[in-house]
Amino acid sequence: MTTIAPIIRLHRIPTDVSQPYICIEGPDRKLWFCESGASKIGRFDPAINSFDEFALPEPAAMPIGITPGADGNMWFCAKKANKIGRITTKGAITLFPLPTADAGPDGTLVGPDGNVWFSEGDAGKIGRITPAGAITEFQDGITPGSRPLSIVPRDNSIWFTEAAGNRIGRITLDGHVTEFPIPSHDSQPRAMTLHPDGSLWFVETNTNALGRVDRDGKITEHPVTTAQASLRGVCVARDGDLWFTENAANKIGRMKPDGTMVGEYPIPVATAGARCITGWRDGRLFFTAFDAGMIGEVSPGCRRYWSVSGPTGAKRILL
């Protein structure tokens, strides 16, 4: 079967040198993202291609990770400010200082307990914050200097990548840690995502592969086609395929859940600096172009849009 190449579009963020990092869908069905270079939280409405930006109260906070919380707000990691932030869909911001100095919070997602969990890459800890702002940190069992990074809940536990430790970690809700070594040496695992079949997938930035973690912690590795592509982000699309960003190769890649490569597709702007990628409810995907200061839009196997006008404006439907 012939696979139709995706359409890739770019949307420029209003603020220069915004350096967008993590992006994810919010409770308002809009794409929220961190502007690490501008110390802002951004929001993109895919229905009308419009942006909103919310400045943080600290000008060099360096927001990185962001996630919707169980309370209907967005929560984010302010790495340089050493704080966890909360922003309402109206733009009201609250910052919560971390107990550990220079912890370097990075990745975050809401856990099965309704709390927001996050990594402290510089401190080598995993943290948890309640909707009320109470923070707990866990360190026992995590290899020192391992740099925990991406956070994903699975099976009533929190799983995380250890970018410098070459391991995948698992922490129970009460703080018990288990680590699983990655077969390849110095693979530098970064972003991770949960597949509907229960497996975890992560990028290996140094060894140019996607890794898969089964429910027992067994890890298999699947190489991508382009050498030294510098994989950064990964997500699962509506069709179950894995889509990922190739930072150095300036491409978006696609892989089947059995490890078969489907294709790699050039990003139509030089040196985009593709980082995070996330799936959307209608089958599209969105990614952050860190170096270009843009939000990328991927329409898999789609040739055109059907535009529909209504009382609330124009909407686009994928064909």
Predicted features and spans:
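A short beta-strand motif characteristic of beta-propeller blades
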Residues: 9-13, 50-56, 93-98, 135-140, ...
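A short helix->beta-strand "capping" segment at the edge of beta-propeller domains
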Residues: 1-16
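Beta-rich, blade/repeat-based domains predominating
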Residues: 16-27, 59-71, 101-113, 143-156, ...
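A short loop-to-beta-strand structural motif that recurs across blades of beta-propeller domains
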Residues: 40-42, 82-85, 124-127, 167-169, ...
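Short loop/turn segments that connect beta-strands within beta-propeller blades
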Residues: 45-49, 87-91, 129-134, 171-176, ...
